[in-house]
Structures are given as structure tokens and as C-alpha cells.
Amino acid sequence: PVAIERLFTSGHQIRSALVLHEKAPRLQELYAAHSVNAPLFTCDRDTMIAVTGFDLHRGVIAAADRKPIPTGSQRNDVLAGLSKIAVLEGLNDPENLGAIARSARAFGVQALVLDERCIDPYTRRSVRVSMGEVLHAPTMRFTSADDLNGLLTGWTTWALTPHHSADDIWQLDLPPRLALM
């Protein structure tokens, strides 16, 4: 599965994986290629369903330790070298967040900046819908409008809308530092 393969290149530390017997050879290859030293458990489909509580049609699930989420001035350090970020507010559907993360990565967005009301970007559903792309983008949170204004100092902000009267973003010149909302 693509999301699991992307986990290996994301910088998140893999703790263990549970796979169907027939998936083990591919996971063993990934473990070796990325020097992962974590348990790899195998089982049959019935056991996996009993352990996870649902039918994983791909037959692979992994647990990983998250990279620390930047806070305070660390956020500015992460943003310093970037040119395009996405700012998300009040997004509480994991499928929507996953779809946005996947699309954002395709369009060169380098980080996700989320308010405190946004769902955890690392929920199983968000990771799966994003096809693992959410694992690659630095993610940080802001706590208030003032906090966001401080983070976006020096950034040009574009509010996106599908409304027919909006400017066509493909016709606009991109500023050197762009925050998409």
C-alpha cells in the first residue's frame, strides 16, 4: 500500500507493523531498504480483523512515533526555508484533510498550518486518503488570529474560492512566499 510505503521515507519512526502473511516479503524489503529495526508481525486475515476491529483490505497496518510538531519559534524556523504553505481552519473531517494534503503536495505546498480545531492530520483515515502525503509535509498549529498573523509575517496570503468571479490562479504570478487559505 502506498501510504505504508511513504511512511518509510517520511522521517516518522516506525514502531511495528502487522501484515498479512502474503504481504510480509514486500514489508521485509522496505524494512531492509530503510534500515528499520522494529517488529514485523504477520497473521492471517481473520486474526487481523480481530486485532484491528475492521477489515483492512490492503492487509497492512503500522504504528509509528510522530515527528515532534514544531511549536513557538520552532515554527518560524521550519517556515523560514519554504515558499508555499496551506493554512486550514476548522477542518474536522479526516477524509477532507487527507484529500487536501494529497492535493497540496501535488501542487508544491511544503507545509500545513492548522488551527486548534482541525482534526489530527495523522489519523488513519487522513493518512490513507492522502496516500501518505500528509506524513511528508511539516505540520504545525496556530492558536489564535494573532498567532497566525505572527506566523504569516512576510507571506502573501491568498484566500481560495471556487466562485466564478474569482481570479484564475493559473493566470496570476506567484509571490515568493505564498500562504493559501
Feature map (PLM): residue ranges:
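Short, hydrophobic beta-strand segments that form beta-sheet elements in well-ordered domains
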Residues: 17-20, 156-162, 179-181
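Glycine-rich phosphate-binding loops that contact phosphosugars or nucleotide phosphates
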Residues: 62
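Short active-site oxyanion
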Residues: 13-17, 36-39, 110-112, 137, ...
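A contiguous loop/helix-start segment that scaffolds small-molecule binding in enzyme catalytic cores
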Residues: 171-180
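Conserved catalytic motifs of the protein kinase core domain
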Residues: 59, 83, 177
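RNA substrate-binding interface of SAM-dependent RNA methyltransferases
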Residues: 5, 9, 41-42, 68-169
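N-terminal positively charged helical leader segments and presequences
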Residues: 1-55, 59, 154
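Short Pro/Gly-enriched coil loops immediately N-terminal to beta-strands
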Residues: 55-57, 132-133, 174
